Amino acid sequence: METAFDIISLVLFIVVILLAFFRKVNVGVVAVTFGVIMVRIFGLTDKDLIGGFSTSMFTTLVGITLLFAAITQTGALDLLARKIIALAGNKMWVLPIMVYIAGFVIAGVGPGAVPALAIIPALAAIIAVEVGFNPLMLVLIGEQGLMAGRMTPITPEAAIITGAAAEANIANVMPTILVCQTLVTIVSSFVFWFIFKGHKVKQPLNPIERGTLEKFNAKQIIALLSIVLMLVLLIFVKVNIGVAAFAVAGLLFLFGIADDGKALKSLPWGTIVMVLAVGSLLNIVNKMGGIDLMSNALAKIMTKGTAT
C-alpha cells in the first residue's frame, strides 16, 4: 500500500482542483479539507500539514498587498496613471511602450520580478480603464516588460540562473538570456496588442488635458516615495521584500498617511488563502512522492523538442 501513496496523493490533489473548479469553492479551503484526511491516510500528522504553510510566502503576499492598499487609499496611483495618460495625449500606442519599459526598469534595476509584479499590474490596470484599453492587455504587456527586466545580471533571478549554469560548466549566460527574453516578450506584447484590439483604440475614453490635473499632495508624494523606500531596503539593505513592505506600510499607518483598518479589509484574503493552502497540500503530495512521480512520467515522454 505504501508504494501506492505517490499515486494516491497525486490523484487526490487533482480531485481537489476539479472539485473546487466545478463547485466554485476556494481551492485553498478544499485543499485544507483534503489535507486533514490525507495526512491520516498517509500516517503523517497535522504538523506536516501546518508546516507546509509558507511563512515566507505569507509575509510577501500580505506585506506587498498591504503596502499597495495603503498607497491606493491616497489616490497616488490613480493620479499617476492620469498624468501618464495626459503625457501620451492621443498617441495611444505610446502607453503600452511606457508600461513595458516601466516593468523592465523596475524589475531590472535589481529587485527582480516580485516587487514589480506588485507595482506594474496595478498601474497598468488603472491606465487601461481610463483610456478604454482592455485592462488584461495592458497588464500582460507590463508583465512582459518585467519578465524581460528580471534577466538583467543584477537581479536575484540572474544569480540563481548563473549559479545553475556554472554547475553545468556554462559561463556568461545572462547576456544571451536577456536578449532572448527581451525579444520574446516584445513579440508577445505585440501579439497581446492585436489580440485585445489595442490598435483600434485611437483616443482616450476620457481625454485628459495636462493643465487640468491637480498636483500630487503631500500624502500622495509620501505614498509614492514609500515604493522607492521599499526598493532601497530590498536592494541596498538586503531586507526581505515582504518584511520591507510590511515595515514601510507600518510607517504610512503610523504617520497617518493611510488607514490600516481600511487597508486590511481590502486585502485579497481569498487569494492569499488559496496560495498558502494549496502550497501546504503540495507539500504533502511531495512528501508522498507524488511530485517525483509526475516529474518522472513527464521525463519519459519528453524529447528535446517537446521540452523546449
Predicted regions located by residue number:
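Short leucine-rich amphipathic alpha-helices used at interfaces
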Residues: 1, 7-8, 95-96, 102, ...
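Hydrophobic transmembrane alpha-helices of multi-pass small-molecule transporters
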Residues: 1-60, 68, 180-293
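Transmembrane alpha-helix interface/packing and boundary motifs in multi-pass membrane proteins
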Residues: 16-24, 102-112, 143-150, 233-237, ...
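A broad structural signal for alpha-helix termini and local helix breaks/kinks
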Residues: 23, 41-42, 88, 131, ...
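Residues that define the loop-to-transmembrane-helix transition and helix capping
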Residues: 28, 93-94, 136-137, 175, ...
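Transmembrane helix boundary and interhelical junction motifs in multipass membrane proteins
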Residues: 28-29, 111-121, 138, 152-158, ...
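Membrane-embedded alpha-helical segments and adjacent helix-loop junctions characteristic
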Residues: 30, 44-130, 264-308
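Membrane-core helix-loop-helix motifs of multi-pass transport proteins
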Residues: 127-210
